[in-house]
UniProtKB/Swiss-Prot annotation:
GO terms for molecular function: nitric-oxide synthase regulator activity. It is found in: Secreted. GO terms for cellular component: extracellular region. This is Dahlein-5.5. It comes from Ranoidea dahlii. The keyword Ion transport does not apply. The lineage of its organism: Eukaryota, Metazoa, Chordata, Craniata, Vertebrata. Keywords: Amphibian defense peptide, Secreted. One of its GO terms (biological process) is defense response. Its main location: secreted. Has no antimicrobial activity. Strongly inhibits the formation of NO by neuronal nitric oxide synthase at micromolar concentrations.
Length: 21
């Protein structure tokens, strides 16, 4: 569903932000 898709996108975004560079 739409919410599931948004959750995946948001989760990926947070993972990238929290990932140490």
């Amino acid at each position: 569903g739409l919410l599931a898709s948004l959750g995946k996108v948001l989760g990926g975004y947070l993972a990238e932000k929290l990932k140490p560079k």
